[in-house]
From Swiss-Prot:
It comes from the Eukaryota. This is Probable serine/threonine-protein kinase kinX. GO terms for cellular component: cytoplasm. The active site is at 146 (proton acceptor). The keyword Repeat applies. Keywords: ATP-binding, Kinase, Nucleotide-binding, Repeat, Serine/threonine-protein kinase, Transferase. It holds the Pfam family PK_Tyr_Ser-Thr. Residues 330-344, 393-408, 433-454, 480-496, 503-523, 587-602, 802-816 have a biased composition (Acidic residues). The keyword Disulfide bond does not apply. It is an enzyme of class 2 (transferase).
C-alpha cells in the first residue's frame, strides 16, 4: 500500500520570489482561498493568487493540505495546455502563488454568453485541448478530481489551459482508489458521488460533462442525471443537444459519461477521436474576440506603510461588480446559484480526522497548536465575520464613481429579488426564534432516523440527492419560488453534511447576530444600487439633452450651408449669363465680318470658276478672237479687283510708299526705263546679274533656297512684273506677307508676296528696284494674275491628273522624256488661257535644255528631242519636275543640264517665263555662283527646301491669285532659264541659272506647284513679257540664237527682261531684241494682248 505525500514543500530558491519584485495591477477574480490579481513579476505579466488563512481558522489544517497539494502538483507541469507555475512569495504570513497570466478568462463565460458564436470546429478544438492536457496529467499519475468549465482558461489564441489543481493528487499504483470525496457535484462521477473507490477514470466522466456543456452551452444540473447518476439520454438528446451537432460528438459524450468506468475511453483515445472529428468540419471560421480584463489600476508594492502594517496591500477604488456576468477568472466556485455555495470546489469544513498531519516549517506563521473548546471557535468565527464586513465596507466607501458599471434590465431584476429576500428574512426574524428551534429539532430527529436506516461504510462519505424540478441556464434568472426551494434543499443538505462531518453545534445567538449583520449589509447594497440607478438615469437624461442640442445645432448649420450654396449658385448663374451675352455680341460681330468676307470671296471664286469652266468647254480660238476675249476678261477682272482690293490696299500702299521712297529715289533710272526697251542684251544681263547677286545674298541668309527666290523673280518678270507688282501691293493692303499656304485664294497678291523668299529677302526691295509698283497700279486686275490664283486644280492636282502619275524623282531623272511639255499647257487651262497653252508646245523647255547644254554640256540637244515628244498637258507635272530638277541641279551640274530644262518648263508652267530673257537668268546664275551651288554642293542644302516642295500645296495661294489672273505668262510657258545669253560665256552658269531660277521662281511652296508664276518683288527691275506666239514661231525663235541664247521659236511666249516695261510694238519671234510689256494704258491702242506678241 502506497501513501500520498501531503507535506508542504519548502520554499526552494528556485521557486521563491521576493515580494518586492511583484507589482499588483488589478483584481481579476476570487477563489476558494482569497483573491486573484493581475500583476507583473520583474516586468513579465503574471497572475498572483493571494492565500490568506487566519491562524485561528478551524479549517486551517484542511486548507493547508489543499494549498500544499496545489503547489506541489503545479510545480511538475510543463505542457502547453496546462497553466505554468512561476513561483511562491510570502509576506507577513500571507502566501502568494504566481502563475502565468491567461487574459481570456474561463471557458464558462463564453459558453453561457449566447451572443458569442462558437463554430463546431472551434468547439471540437476546445475539447481536443482539454483532452491533451488531461492525457498529459494522467501520464504523470495525477488525478485532477475537479475538472469543470470554470477551471479551463482561454488565452488570446483560443488555446485552452487547465488550472486549479487544489484537489489534484498523485496516485500510486498500490493505492489508487481510496481517496476522499472532492470536486463539484454537477461534474462529479457516479462512483465519487456514491462514495465508491475511484481513480483517474473519474476525470473522464467529468470531461464528458464538460463536453456536454460545450455542445449544449447549458450549465450542468441534477435534472440531467438519471437514477444511476449517469446522463439521462432522453432529456439530453431531446432538450439539450442542437440539431446541427455532429453525431460523433454526441456519441463521444455518452461514451465518456458511461456509468461503468470500464466502458469509458482513455484520454488518448478521446484525443484521436476528436482529431478525426475535426477533419470532417469546416475549418474556415472566424474566431470570436477574447474579452479583456476590466478596469486595471497600478498598485505600488514599494510603499513602506503597507509592509509595516503587514499583509498584502489592499486594493482601493475597485468597482463593486454586480452583474449577471461572472468575471472571476480564477474562480474556484460557482456563485450563480445558491445550491453551489456549499458544494463547489472548496476544502470540506473542518473534521476530527486524525490523518491530517500537515504542518508548516518552524519559521512559518502557520505553525500553531490545535485549538480546543467552543469559545475559541466562536471567537474565530466572529473575527472572520468582522474581517469580511471591513473588506466590504472599504470596497463600498472607496468605490470610485468613475468605475461605476452600467446596469441593464437584468440588474433591476436582481435588485428586486434581493429586496424580496430581505423582506422575507425580516418577517422570519419577527416570528421569533422559538419556531426556528422547533423546526431545527424536528429536522435533527428526522436525520437521525435516516442515518439509522442507512449503512454508512466510511464516515467521510456524504449523501447527495438530485432533484429534477428546475432547469438552469446561464442567461435565465431564478424565480422566487425556485430560490425558496433551493434554500430548503440547501438547509437539508447542509444539515446532513454537518451531521456527517461535524460534531459541534452553532449557538442560536451567533446565528441571529450573523443574520442581522447580513440584513444590514443587504440594505446597504440595495441603497447603493438605488443610488447608482438614479445616477445613471441622470446621466442618460443629460446625454439625451446634449444629443438634442447637437441635433439642433447641426440642423442650423445645414440650413446656413444650404443658403450659402444657393447664393453661390445664383451668383454663378448671373455671371454665366453675362458671359454668354458678351460672347453672343462678339459672335454676332464676328459673323457680320465673316459674312462680308465670304461674300467677297464668293464673288471672286464664282468669277474664277466661271472663267475656268468657259476655258475648259471652249476649244482654242484664233488669235484675234482670243485677244478680244482676253480684253473683255481683263476689264471684268479690273472692275472686280478694284472694288474688292483697292479699298483695303490704299492704307498699306501709303505705308509702303513711305518706306520705299528712299529706295525709289535710288532706283529712278530703272523706273524711267519702263517705257524704253533694253539698250543691249549685254547691259541688261550685267544689271540682272548684279541684282541677282544681291538677291541671292539676301535670300541665302533667311532662306536656304536662293535659287527658288531667283526663279520666282524670273517668273514674276516673265509674267510682266508691272502687273505682278501691282497685285502684290494690293494684296499687301489686305494682309502682310506670310506663307503662301496661309494666304487665302481671295488675295493672290499676298500669296505672291508671302513666298518665303519674298519675306526673307523683303520682296518689297525687288519691287522697288524693278519699280513695278506703278505698273502694278496700272495692271492691278490683269486676268493672268487671277488665273494664276484660279489654278485650284494645281492645288487639288485635279487639273493636272498626270501630276499624280508622274513622280518628282522620275522627272528629275528623265525630265524631258517623262515630263511632257503638254503639262504646262494644262496648267494654262486652269489659268483660263488654255488656248495659248495648246498652241504653245513646250518646245521652250527643249530650247532651255539646249541652252543649258550649251552652257554646261551639249547634251541639251538630246533634251530637245524628248521635249519634242513632250506634250503640254499637265503643268502640275512640270512643276513637280521643276522641284525635282532643283534637287538634281544642286546635286549634279553636268547631268542636270537637262533638269534645268525641266525647271524651265516648270518655270513656264509657273508663269516664270523669265528664262525667255536669257540675260536675266544668266545674271541670276552669278548669284548662284556666289552661292556656289554647282561647285560647292551648297545647293544641295537648297535641295532641302526643294525636298520640302510644299509649294505644291502652295498652289492654293496660286488660286488666291485668281484676281491677278497672270495665266498669260503661264499659258506661254517660256523656257526662260533656257534663253540665256551667257551660257556661251559661262557654260556652267546657265545650268546654275536654271537651277537658281527654279528655286527663285517661287518660294519653296510655289517653285514647282505654281506654274502660273506667282508675282514676287525681286531686286531685278527688268520686266518679263510673255509673248504668245504659235508653236512654229517659238521653234523658230529657239533655232535663232541671240547672244549665245536660244530664243524659243516653238514657245508661245518670249520673256524680255527689261528694267522697266516700255510701250513698244511686239518684236518678231526670231529677233534677239527684247520686247517690253505693254502698259495697261496702251492696251486699247493695241490690236493684240498685252501678254502675247505676234
Amino acid at each position: 500500500m502506497g501513501s500520498v505525500d501531503t507535506s508542504v514543500p519548502s520554499f526552494d530558491r528556485a521557486w521563491s520570489i521576493k515580494y518586492e519584485d511583484l507589482d499588483f495591477i488589478s483584481e481579476i477574480g476570487s477563489g476558494g482561498f482569497g483573491k486573484v490579481f493581475k500583476g507583473e513579476y520583474l516586468g513579465a505579466p503574471v497572475a498572483i493568487k493571494k492565500i490568506h488563512i487566519l491562524p485561528d481558522d478551524p479549517n486551517r489544517v484542511d486548507l493547508e493540505k489543499f494549498l500544499n497539494r496545489e503547489i506541489e502538483t503545479i510545480k511538475l507541469f510543463t505542457h502547453p495546455n496546462v497553466i505554468q507555475f512561476v513561483g511562491i512569495s510570502e509576506n507577513n504570513g500571507i502566501l502568494f502563488i504566481v502563475t502565468e497570466l491567461i487574459e481570456g478568462g474561463d471557458l464558462q463565460y463564453y459558453l453561457k454568453n449566447q451572443s458569442i458564436d462558437l463554430p463546431w470546429f472551434l468547439r471540437a478544438n476546445i475539447a481536443l485541448d482539454v483532452s491533451l492536457a488531461m492525457s498529459y496529467l494522467h501520464s504523470k499519475s495525477i488525478v485532477h478530481r475537479d475538472l469543470k468549465s470554470t477551471n479551463l482558461l482561454v488565452d488570446k489564441n483560443w488555446k485552452i489551459k487547465v488550472c486549479d489543481f487544489g484537489f489534484a493528487r498523485i496516485v500510486e499504483e498500490d493505492n489508487n482508489k481510496s481517496m476522499t470525496i472532492c470536486g463539484t457535484d454537477n461534474w462529479m462521477s457516479p462512483e465519487m458521488i456514491t462514495g465508491l473507490d475511484y481513480d483517474e477514470r473519474s476525470d473522464i466522466f467529468s470531461f464528458g460533462i464538460v463536453l456536454l456543456e460545450i455542445i449544449s452551452r447549458v450549465k450542468p444540473a441534477p435534472y440531467m442525471r438519471d437514477a444511476s447518476f449517469g446522463l439521462a439520454e432522453d432529456i439530453v438528446r431531446n432538450q439539450l443537444i442542437p440539431t446541427d451537432c455532429p453525431e460523433s460528438l454526441i456519441d463521444l459524450t455518452f461514451n465518456c459519461c458511461s456509468v461503468d468506468p470500464n466502458n469509458r475511453p482513455s484520454f488518448k483515445e478521446i484525443s484521436q477521436t476528436l482529431k478525426q472529428i475535426k477533419t470532417t468540419l469546416d475549418s474556415n471560421i472566424v474566431y470570436p474576440e477574447i474579452r479583456d480584463f476590466e478596469q486595471q489600476q497600478k498598485i505600488s508594492t514599494t510603499n513602506g506603510n503597507n509592509k509595516q502594517n503587514g499583509g498584502a496591500p489592499k486594493i482601493n477604488n475597485l468597482p463593486l461588480q454586480y452583474s449577471n456576468n461572472n468575471n472571476n477568472i480564477y474562480d474556484d466556485d460557482d456563485d450563480d446559484d445558491d445550491d453551489d455555495d456549499d458544494n463547489d470546489s472548496f476544502p470540506r469544513p473542518y473534521s476530527d480526522n486524525s490523518n491530517s498531519n500537515v504542518t508548516l516549517e518552524s519559521n512559518s506563521n502557520y505553525n500553531s497548536s490545535t485549538i480546543n473548546g467552543q469559545e475559541q471557535q466562536e471567537q474565530q468565527e466572529q473575527q472572520q465575520q468582522q474581517q469580511v464586513k471591513e473588506e466590504r465596507d472599504e470596497g463600498e466607501i472607496e468605490q470610485d464613481d468613475d468605475n461605476i458599471e452600467v446596469y441593464d434590465s437584468d440588474y433591476q431584476k436582481k435588485l428586486e429579488e434581493h429586496q424580496k429576500e430581505l423582506l422575507e428574512r425580516q418577517n422570519q426574524n419577527q416570528e421569533g426564534s422559538t419556531d426556528e428551534n422547533e423546526v431545527y429539532e424536528q429536522e435533527e430527529e428526522e436525520e437521525e432516523e435516516d442515518e439509522e436506516e442507512q449503512v454508512i461504510s466510511t464516515p467521510a462519505k456524504k449523501r447527495i440527492s438530485f432533484g429534477q424540478d428546475t432547469f438552469h441556464t446561464y442567461e435565465a434568472y431564478r424565480t422566487d419560488d425556485e430560490d425558496d426551494d433551493d434554500d430548503e434543499e440547501d438547509e437539508e443538505e447542509g444539515d446532513e453534511y454537518d451531521h456527517g462531518y461535524d460534531d459541534f453545534d452553532e449557538d442560536d445567538e451567533d446565528d441571529e447576530e450573523y443574520d442581522e449583520d447580513e440584513d444590514d449589509e443587504d440594505e446597504r447594497q440595495i441603497q447603493y444600487y438605488q443610488q447608482q440607478l438614479q445616477y445613471q438615469q441622470q446621466l442618460q437624461k443629460q446625454q439625451e439633452q446634449e444629443y438634442q442640442r447637437q441635433q439642433q445645432l447641426q440642423l442650423q448649420r445645414e440650413e446656413e450651408e444650404y443658403q450659402r450654396q444657393l447664393q453661390q449658385q445664383q451668383q454663378q448663374q448671373q455671371q454665366q449669363q453675362q458671359q454668354q451675352q458678351q460672347h453672343q455680341q462678339q459672335y454676332d460681330d464676328d459673323d457680320d465680318d465673316d459674312d462680308e468676307e465670304e461674300e467677297e470671296y464668293d464673288d471672286v471664286i464664282r468669277h474664277d470658276t466661271d472663267s475656268e469652266e468657259e476655258s475648259k468647254d471652249k476649244t482654242p480660238l484664233p488669235w484675234d478672237q482670243h485677244f478680244e476675249k482676253q480684253k473683255e476678261s481683263e476689264n471684268k477682272v479690273e472692275q472686280e479687283e478694284t472694288n474688292v482690293v483697292v479699298a483695303n490696299s490704299q492704307e498699306t500702299e501709303q505705308q509702303q510708299q513711305q518706306q520705299q521712297q528712299p529706295k525709289e529715289e535710288e532706283e529712278e533710272e530703272p523706273t524711267k526705263v519702263e517705257d524704253v526697251k533694253v539698250e543691249t542684251e549685254e547691259q541688261t544681263k550685267e544689271e540682272h546679274d548684279v541684282k541677282v547677286d544681291e538677291e541671292s545674298t539676301k535670300v541665302d541668309e533667311p532662306v536656304d533656297e536662293p535659287t527658288k527666290v531667283e526663279e520666282s523673280v524670273e517668273q514674276v518678270k516673265a509674267e510682266e512684273p508691272n502687273k505682278v507688282e501691282e497685285l502684290v501691293e494690293e494684296v499687301k493692303v489686305e494682309e502682310e506677307p506670310t506663307n503662301v499656304e496661309e494666304v487665302k485664294a481671295e488675295e493672290p497678291v499676298e500669296e505672291v508676296k508671302v513666298e518665303e523668299p519674298v519675306e526673307e529677302v523683303k520682296a518689297e526691295e525687288p519691287v522697288e528696284e524693278v519699280k513695278a509698283e506703278e505698273p502694278v497700279e496700272e495692271v492691278k486686275t490683269e486676268e493672268p494674275v487671277e488665273e494664276v490664283k484660279v489654278e485650284e486644280p494645281v492645288e487639288e492636282v485635279k487639273v493636272e491628273e498626270p501630276v499624280e502619275e508622274v513622280e518628282a524623282e522620275e522627272s528629275v531623272q528623265e525630265p524631258v522624256e517623262e515630263v511632257k511639255v503638254d503639262e504646262p499647257t494644262k496648267v494654262e487651262e486652269p489659268t483660263k488661257v488654255e488656248e495659248p497653252i495648246e498652241e504653245v508646245k513646250v518646245e521652250e523647255p527643249t530650247k532651255v535644255e539646249e541652252s543649258i547644254e550649251e552652257v554646261k554640256v551639249e547634251e541639251p540637244t538630246k533634251v530637245e528631242e524628248p521635249v519634242e515628244e513632250i506634250k503640254p498637258e499637265e503643268p502640275t507635272k512640270v512643276e513637280e519636275s521643276v522641284e525635282d530638277v532643283k534637287v538634281e541641279d544642286v546635286k549634279v551640274e553636268e547631268v542636270k543640264a537637262e533638269e534645268p530644262t525641266k525647271a524651265e518648263e516648270s518655270v513656264e508652267d509657273v508663269k516664270v517665263e523669265e528664262p525667255i530673257k536669257v540675260e536675266e537668268p544668266v545674271k541670276v546664275e552669278e548669284p548662284v555662283k556666289v552661292e556656289e551651288p554647282v561647285k560647292v554642293e551648297e545647293p544641295i542644302k537648297v535641295e532641302e527646301p526643294i525636298k520640302v516642295e510644299e509649294p505644291i500645296k502652295v498652289e492654293e495661294p496660286i488660286k488666291v491669285e485668281e484676281p491677278i489672273k497672270v495665266e498669260e505668262p503661264v499659258k506661254v510657258e517660256v523656257a526662260s532659264p533656257v534663253v540665256q545669253e551667257q551660257p556661251p560665256q559661262q557654260e556652267e552658269k546657265p545650268e546654275v541659272v536654271s537651277t537658281s531660277t527654279i528655286t527663285i521662281a517661287s518660294s519653296p511652296q510655289q517653285s514647282s506647284n505654281s506654274p502660273p508664276s506667282t508675282p514676287v518683288k525681286q531686286p531685278q527691275q527688268q520686266e518679263i513679257e510673255v509673248n504668245s506666239t504659235p508653236i512654229k514661231q517659238q521653234q523658230q525663235q529657239q533655232q535663232t540664237p541671240t547672244q549665245q541664247t536660244q530664243t524659243p521659236t516653238k514657245q508661245h511666249t518670249e520673256i524680255n527682261v527689261q528694267p522697266t516695261p516700255t510701250k513698244t510694238p511686239p518684236l518678231p519671234p526670231q529677233t534677239n531684241e527684247k520686247i517690253p510689256l505693254i502698259s495697261p494704258n496702251n492696251k486699247s491702242n493695241r490690236g493684240c494682248c498685252s501678254c502675247f506678241i505676234q
